[in-house]
Structures are given as structure tokens and as C-alpha cells.
């Protein structure tokens, strides 16, 4: 190295397996750091003690090191990490006994040999304790069986709702508005199957197969099944209404994102576009689905009132009859309360999965 070259201030520290060099240069540009024949060579442009210039230095290490240094440039300095070939404690950094003038200990990271050994021992103990704790946790012999069941469940539901969505979309393009009025007769069997199978989601939550809370699952499953089996299934007059098309369509679109997301999660796979769709699509679709359910209830109330279906007459002097249409009006209020509970839950889930990550303060 030429005598006229500028050398930056370099601070060093060590552990049993690593060497740390902190080069006091700010705004570093074009750093060239290499190790050959156990000599580290450094050259870079940056702002040091002599202003903005090109600085360089070389260090011949006391003992063999790995030839691949790791560099990390910050606005204020450049950090170099070098791996020792053998775990040992060096009495000095350089092969030459006299310390170069530009080199000094890094007291921010400095440990003597006993401190370093204590740190190494603590890490080993922490690793051993972690292994002991993991060994104490009982292994679930049915883990793979449970995972296989959840994957198959979500796959079947995804295929079922995909069939509903594709069938309705094709019919809409071919028949136009006419497809609105016979949706129930062509789609109901598959919807019955999917919504009956959805009862398993409540069971899965009850027995702890999934970590999803129970109440949102109960609200959604029983809410949909009440509309499907009680309101639509029992009134032929409702089965030809256009609202059935929109109701089934919104339900199926929501599940096209939900079930594949859960299926991939069971396999330990995260696909970010699908995660975004899972926790974003509900924002327009859940209100639209809730609106379709409300319209369905409102249209069915006069029919239940006129036919007296499911109304209960009590044998008493006042001849009081509990009208099912009145219960539907009460249920209409409960519907919006249930939607609010699910909206709140989904909003929290969205913040958890898509919100900004909190940075830990050092």
C-alpha cells in the first residue's frame, strides 16, 4: 500500500468464531473488500477524518480466516464480519506484533476471553433448555391425520363453491336476466351440500382443530343455513325471486378466497396475493351478502304472515298466536348485529395479517 494513501479509523472486536471490524467512514461508495492469503484488503470512497476521499488499508490476520467477509454499509460506518477458521481466542488481530496506528479496540463490542466464554456458554445453555422444553411437549399422534382432514375439507368446499360460481356465471352470460329466476332450482342442491358441510366448521372450532373463534363461525353458518333451509327451502314463492341469485353469488365469491387460503395455510404455504384477497374481499362482499340476506327476509315476511306458516297458536283464553313473521322481524335486527360482530372480527384479522409490522426497538 502506498505511503500517501489515506487510512480510515478501524475498530475491532472478536468472539470465539468471529471478528468484527467497524470502519469509520460515512456515505461510503463503491466499497471493495476482499480476503486473499489471509490478508484483508479494503478500498472505498467515503467521508472520513480527511474529508471525502478514497481510503484504503490492509490487515494480515494473526490466524487463518474464511475468505468471504460479510459487509454491511450504513450511513455512518461500514461493518465487516469475518469468520475464523477455528474457534479460538486471539491475543491480537494482526500477525505483526506492533498494532497499526489506524487500528483500535471497539469498546462498544469488546469482551475479554472469560466474558466471551460466558456468553458462549449462555447461548449453549439456552439452546439446550429450548431442546428440553420442546422434548417435554407431547407429540400429537394424530397431527398428520388432522392436517389431512382439514386440507380435504377446505378442498371439497372450494370445489363446491367453485362449481356454484362457474355455473351461475356461465348461465348469466348465456341466459342473461332470465337466469336470476331459476337459480334456486339449478343451484340449491349443491348449496345445500356445501352449507350442511359448513356445520363442520363449528365442530372444528369446538374441539380445537382450528384456532378460529367459535362465535363468528356460529353466526355465519347458522345465519346462512336459516336463510337457505327455513326461508328459501320452505317457501316456493321465494325460490323464484331474483334476490336468490345475488345471495348465492355473493356467498360463493367470498368462499373462493377463504377456503383455498385455509387449505394452503394447513400445508404451511402463504401466497401473498391470496392472503390479500382473503382479508380484503370481505370489505365489499360481506355488506352485499348481508344486504341480500336482509332483502330475502323482508320479501318473505308478508308471505309467512299471509300463510301463517311456522306460526304457533297457544291454547289460552286470549287466543294468542306467535306469528313467525314477527320473529323474522326480530331476526332481521339480529342479522345486522351478527354482521357487525363478524365485521369487527374480520377487521382485526385484516390488521393482524396485512397491517404494518411493528419494529422492535433496540
UniProtKB/Swiss-Prot annotation:
Compartments (UniProt record): Endoplasmic reticulum membrane
Residues in coiled coil: 111-135
UniProt xrefs under PROSITE patterns: CS
Pathway(s) of this molecule: Lipid metabolism; fatty acid biosynthesis
GO molecular function: 3-hydroxyacyl-CoA dehydratase activity; very-long-chain (3R)-3-hydroxyacyl-CoA dehydratase activity
Enzymatic reactions: a very-long-chain (3R)-3-hydroxyacyl-CoA = a very-long-chain (2E)-enoyl-CoA + H2O; (3R)-hydroxyhexadecanoyl-CoA = (2E)-hexadecenoyl-CoA + H2O
Keyword set includes Acetylation: no
The protein's name in its UniProt record: Very-long-chain (3R)-3-hydroxyacyl-CoA dehydratase
Organism encoding this protein: Gallus gallus (Chicken)
